[in-house]
Amino acid sequence: MLWDSNQVYQAADAKNYETYIPTEKHIKSFEELQKINPDVIGWIRVNDTNINYPLLQTDDDDTYMNTDAEGKYSLSGAIFLHCGNKPDFSDFNNIIYGHHMEKHMMFGDIGEFTKEQYFNEHPYGNLFFDGKNHGIEFYALMQVDAYNETIFNVCPDTSEEKQAYLLEIIDNALYKRCLLYTSPSP
């Protein structure tokens, strides 16, 4: 079966989900999307990019590789949080997946961050979950192998694992910003 690539890109267009974009004052449309698909846990936006999508999570990371936010089959899939992460983003390391696509669809704009000026001009984004906006500050850019166990360790438990994670970023980032990290109180 041949797929028309335009159909794939149309399915991946963030404009398909504009009616569901939540704000703290208006979440009704977002709640409607959650009724369509209860796996919708939030929304991710990277300021001044085309990354502006519902965020999903299920107990199987393969599900949203080819399923959209409304639960329909789609080659472009959806943006989703690793199944091992807590949906309240309280883990030390939260991993969000999505296809890197052409035409600035899904995580297609991530490639732009490899340009230093673009990285410097796009430091912020937003995660909407639990009915609130939670700002994101992007502090480093790395290109890593998908099998890098330090970076893709969903829940580093020990202070040594957390230290190794941070050192891996500091030592291997293409670009980075100063960021003050304080360990949460036990």
Q: What name fits each language-model region?
A:
Residues M1-Y20:
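N-terminal membrane-targeting segments
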Residues P22-V40, Q57-N85, M105-Y124, A173-R177:
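N-terminal post-signal-peptidase region of extra-cytosolic proteins
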Residues F80-L81, N85-T150:
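Mid-length scaffold segments of soluble, non-membrane domains
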Residues L141-L180:
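An amphipathic alpha-helical core segment
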Residues Y181-P186:
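Conserved small/polar residues in nucleotide/adenosyl-binding loops
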